[in-house]
Amino acid sequence: MGLSSQNGQLRGPVKPSGGPGGGGTQTQQQMNQLKNTNTINNGTQQQAQSMTTTIKPGDDWKKTLKLPPKDLRIKTSDVTSTKGNEFEDYCLKRELLMGIFEMGWEKPSPIQEESIPIALTGRDILARAKNGTGKSGAYLIPLLERLDLKKDNIQAMVIVPTRELALQVSQICIQVSKHMGGAKVMATTGGTNLRDDIMRLDDTVHVVIATPGRILDLIKKGVAKVDHVQMIVLDEADKLLSQDFVQIMEDIILTLPKNRQILLYSATFPLSVQKFMNSHLQKPYEINLMEELTLKGVTQYYAYVTERQKVHCLNTLFPRLQTNQSIIFCNSSQRVELLAKKISQLGYSCFYIHAKMRQEHRNRVFHDFRNGLCRNLVCTDLFTRGIDIQAVNVVINFDFPKLAETYLHRIGRSGRFGHLGLAINLITYDDRFNLKSIEEQLGTEIKPIPSNIDKSLYVAEYHSEPVEDEKP
């Protein structure tokens, strides 16, 4: 069939998903816009360039903004159930506000309303909120507001569990701060040349966004000087404080000034997080926006299959679904590559990504999928933490997870920021007890898949109801 495999990208004769119309892919104009945005390579230091437009007191500065197209898709109460605050209410720098609005962030989400004013006071925060409800903005906005750009030292650190999430947060940070002339952001993660990072730290860096092992290595070598760090953020704190990372995080905290501010953000808070909080946070402000664990906009189904029927089931689903982009999860790296190959042989364009791939290949797949160059991505749980790709409206668990926490993070890749999404689970005989257990633990209902799935459940254009208005 003439398949080619290159760096996690499998290409065969491409069939459009979703039947007639191709399933609502991004327009060429949108793709070109995405391609033109800055790409943050691992360890790359970027300076937010100030714009040539001079903002004078009294100017109607909002008229100078280059706003993205307004997102008219329906949003659920996960992000619209707010107090009615505006970003201007927080007395933020005008240059920061410009970056916020040019990101398309019109009003603060519930987690942003709760977090931003408290974080600006310097108080520690323990925040629990659903995936895809604006946590990155909740900590990046106060972080950038509190920077003193006259100083040339590291003032804030954001620690994340995966390399891909570090690159994503770096991109957001740079875009939001682009009007703050001189704000310098550096991403540093494992899997890249340590010497390059050492050289970049010779220059001014204000914000470091890193994975735990790499930043601790740089601190121990005396290259990353953290004695002036005033804020550290642990994004996906439950993972960072799991057995894999907790000792590294303890070592990092010990290198920081005693009066630093600590912000913890996660969807789940196990005992390890509580223990860390008791040891290191000082009278933290606690935020809990998790009345229910799963996103309101994600509809969940299961299909009973045998192991041999799984690929056939996918082949049946693809033409019936109105897929914009989909993420398909497997439980091992080997199964990821095998499934990606089979999907390509069926005639569907497919990328794959897992932790055993070389970092530059992972970066390329992540970048290209995010930019809409492929509709389907097969991956391991590497892609469950914080990764935000707004175009994803379908998640398929080809292999059903054993843990409720893993399931929660997987299906949270769709339905981002209050939008609609669909999660389909292929359940074998051996999975049936896990299915029941996860339903009970999350307090959610996973329904049998119907013969025809109502497109209004996961495709915004088919939704008959008007977009929910924010509360006045």
Swiss-Prot record:
What's the protein here called?
Answer: Probable ATP-dependent RNA helicase DDX6
* GO CC, alphabetical: cytoplasm; cytoplasmic ribonucleoprotein granule; nucleus; P-body
Q: Please provide the Gene Ontology terms (biological process) for this protein.
A: miRNA-mediated gene silencing by inhibition of translation; negative regulation of translation; P-body assembly
Q: Where is the PTM Phosphothreonine found along the chain?
A: T25
Q: Where is the Helicase C-terminal domain?
A: 297-457
Protein location: Cytoplasm, P-body; Cytoplasm; Nucleus; Cytoplasm, Cytoplasmic ribonucleoprotein granule
InterPro entries, per the entry: DEAD/DEAH_box_helicase_dom, Helicase_ATP-bd, Helicase_C-like, P-loop_NTPase, RNA-helicase_DEAD-box_CS, RNA_helicase_DEAD_Q_motif
Function, as annotated, reads:
Essential for the formation of P-bodies, cytosolic membrane-less ribonucleoprotein granules involved in RNA metabolism through the coordinated storage of mRNAs encoding regulatory functions. Plays a role in P-bodies to coordinate the storage of translationally inactive mRNAs in the cytoplasm and prevent their degradation. In the process of mRNA degradation, plays a role in mRNA decapping. Blocks autophagy in nutrient-rich conditions by repressing the expression of ATG-related genes through degradation of their transcripts.
The record lists the organism as: Cavia porcellus (Guinea pig)
What is this organism's lineage?
Answer: Eukaryota, Metazoa, Chordata, Craniata, Vertebrata
Q: Where is this motif: Q motif?
A: 85-113
- Stored Pfam families: DEAD, Helicase_C
Residue ranges of the TM segments = none
- Describe the family membership recorded for this protein in Swiss-Prot or TrEMBL: Belongs to the DEAD box helicase family. DDX6/DHH1 subfamily.
Q: Does the keyword Nucleotide-binding apply?
A: yes
